[in-house]
Amino acid sequence: MGVNAVHWFRKGLRLHDNPALKECIQGADTIRCVYILDPWFAGSSNVGINRWRFLLQCLEDLDANLRKLNSRLFVIRGQPADVFPRLFKEWNITKLSIEYDSEPFGKERDAAIKKLATEAGVEVIVRISHTLYDLDKIIELNGGQPPLTYKRFQTLISKMEPLEIPVETITSEVIEKCTTPLSDDHDEKYGVPSLEELGFDTDGLSSAVWPGGETEALTRLERHLERKAWVANFERPRMNANSLLASPTGLSPYLRFGCLSCRLFYFKLTDLYKKVKKNSSPPLSLYGQLLWREFFYTAATNNPRFDKMEGNPICVQIPWDKNPEALAKWAEGRTGFPWIDAIMTQLRQEGWIHHLARHAVACFLTRGDLWISWEEGMKVFEELLLDADWSINAGSWMWLSCSSFFQQFFHCYCPVGFGRRTDPNGDYIRRYLPVLRGFPAKYIYDPWNAPEGIQKVAKCLIGVNYPKPMVNHAEASRLNIERMKQIYQQLSRYRGLGLLASVPSNPNGNGGFMGYSAENIPGCSSSGSCSQGSGILHYAHGDSQQTHLLKQGRSSMGTGLSGGKRPSQEEDTQSIGPKVQRQSTN
């Protein structure tokens, strides 16, 4: 009997740097590449039309690239546990390959499939290629616990073995001795479905701002590297109005779906840096996006409650308000704050927003204004954001809501001043909120302050054509900062440790978040609504009080707390999330 192999695509939707697929092909007589439409995407999450379209485009591109190798993609609907026993028998499978999935749900699913494969006499190949590092080795190096500060994480990876270079792309030469059995009715049986076939109404759906697939990902990577003039002097580009728009060099959705190998990106950045800097060693900060990604993957891999507040050993238990009406206004871009509403409109229309825009809307929903749980915001991002990833999405929301990682609860984004500083003319607002197009720049971020005559000229009456602000930002943010302060002081007293949480004497110093203060942001009061400060809590691993704390319900931080120095400005202003550092993706 010949060697009949199957490679199961999940993430990792590419032919370049795919070690599991490459090894699966070696020595095989037949190869079938399958994608099962269910596990995470169609099953457990509410996924919006833009994300589905991106996935289907990825699958279409993968199928097109496999066709060039006289192969095809087999798209199969169902649950993996039901599908594979049938395929093992029907195709006489002897070998199955998969890319390692570090997320708890994925590990549980894969363990079940490996058990079924073993029972059927099928060899299973698992290789790491969605992350740069073996996350278990990072945790082992840290005494069995995931590092919960980025600085500690950097220290650990600096001790790791050098990264392996990407494996060669699957080409006709690689696959030449391996055939794919195909039938005339392949498209009917195994073709990539359309959005309509999946039940989506596509009337009025605009063209994709982010086309899915490996081909597009590699094109963008080359463009991305070409415009990296910042590498020469290693300076970050300054944020401006254009930064808020989708870039033809953006990479985050492609890394999330594995259309682009993170290792390829890493080594391309390294090569470019060495070329410009004459072979000097690149700093870790060059890889900002990739390393923050690894940081959150590492924190989440052994924590099935990572996306929940309750029962999550690294998350502070905060008594958030339940307010479905306010949540809906935020999610649908009806807050009455043009900056927030424009961001949420862009997210719903295009499936992507700039990382600092993510900071603004996350702060507004949680600790800044509405005091609604980060879990609710995370679910909205999971539905709408192309690059939403279970580990990174949950980690970002915990961080931005001051529920875990770095706590900086005095730092609050002003929903008027932050946007005005970024885009003084208001072009971004006019693009996504055309109802406000007629307002002059002076009032476009706070149109409720415009005299009635100006509102009439703009053909937009506040409270009629566009909503009034749903909250008083100055009052809400001041109240919420006090709430957060009390939570951390209570936690600090309970733990018998001091808490560093005070407004610095120099409000315009460079240690503040984005360097903003109440005094230098128009539209923000100086009484705390945008004040800078430090609420940093550093973690010391190996705390024996974890179980006791969980039972007490005060906190489920899971690690010791100690007052510490502020992070460096580089660390302090890192953007967290699927798009995680300014110089890395756009």
Swiss-Prot record:
A motif (LIR 4) lies at residues 255-260. FAD binds at residues 252, 289, 355, 387-389. Binds 1 FAD per subunit. Only a minority of the protein molecules contain bound FAD. Contrary to the situation in photolyases, the FAD is bound in a shallow, surface-exposed pocket. Binds 1 5,10-methenyltetrahydrofolate (MTHF) non-covalently per subunit. Its main location: cytoplasm. A motif (LIR 11) lies at residues 430-435. Induction: Expression is regulated by light and circadian rhythms and osicllates diurnally. Peak expression in the suprachiasma nucleus (SCN) and eye at the day/night transition (CT12). Levels decrease with BMAL1-CLOCK inhibition as part of the autoregulatory feedback loop. A motif (LIR 3) lies at residues 151-156. Gene3D superfamilies: 1.25.40.80, DNA Cyclobutane Dipyrimidine Photolyase, subunit A, domain 3, HUPs. Residues 552-586 are annotated as: Disordered. A motif (LIR 1) lies at residues 50-54. The keyword Iron-sulfur does not apply. A motif (LIR 7) lies at residues 335-339. A motif (LIR 5) lies at residues 271-276. The modification Phosphoserine is found at residues 71, 247, 280, 568. A motif (LIR 2) lies at residues 82-87. A motif (LIR 8) lies at residues 379-384. GO terms for molecular function: blue light photoreceptor activity; DNA binding; double-stranded DNA binding; E-box binding; FAD binding; histone deacetylase binding; nuclear receptor binding; phosphatase binding. Residues 471-493 are annotated as: Interaction with TIMELESS. KL001 (N-[3-(9H-carbazol-9-yl)-2-hydroxypropyl]-N-(2-furanylmethyl)-methanesulfonamide) binds to CRY1 and stabilizes it by inhibiting FBXL3- and ubiquitin-dependent degradation of CRY1 resulting in lengthening of the circadian periods. Its cofactor is FAD; (6R)-5,10-methylene-5,6,7,8-tetrahydrofolate. Residues 3-132 form the Photolyase/cryptochrome alpha/beta domain. One of its GO terms (biological process) is entrainment of circadian clock by photoperiod. Phosphorylation on Ser-247 by MAPK is important for the inhibition of CLOCK-BMAL1-mediated transcriptional activity. Phosphorylation by CSNK1E requires interaction with PER1 or PER2. Phosphorylation at Ser-71 and Ser-280 by AMPK decreases protein stability. Phosphorylation at Ser-568 exhibits a robust circadian rhythm with a peak at CT8, increases protein stability, prevents SCF(FBXL3)-mediated degradation and is antagonized by interaction with PRKDC. Ubiquitinated by the SCF(FBXL3) and SCF(FBXL21) complexes, regulating the balance between degradation and stabilization. The SCF(FBXL3) complex is mainly nuclear and mediates ubiquitination and subsequent degradation of CRY1. In contrast, cytoplasmic SCF(FBXL21) complex-mediated ubiquitination leads to stabilize CRY1 and counteract the activity of the SCF(FBXL3) complex. The SCF(FBXL3) and SCF(FBXL21) complexes probably mediate ubiquitination at different Lys residues. It is linked to Delayed sleep phase syndrome: A circadian rhythm sleep disorder characterized by sleep-onset insomnia and difficulty in awakening at the desired time. Patients with DSPS have chronic difficulty in adjusting their sleep-onset and wake-up times to occupational, school, and social activities. Belongs to the DNA photolyase class-1 family. This is Cryptochrome-1. It comes from Homo sapiens.
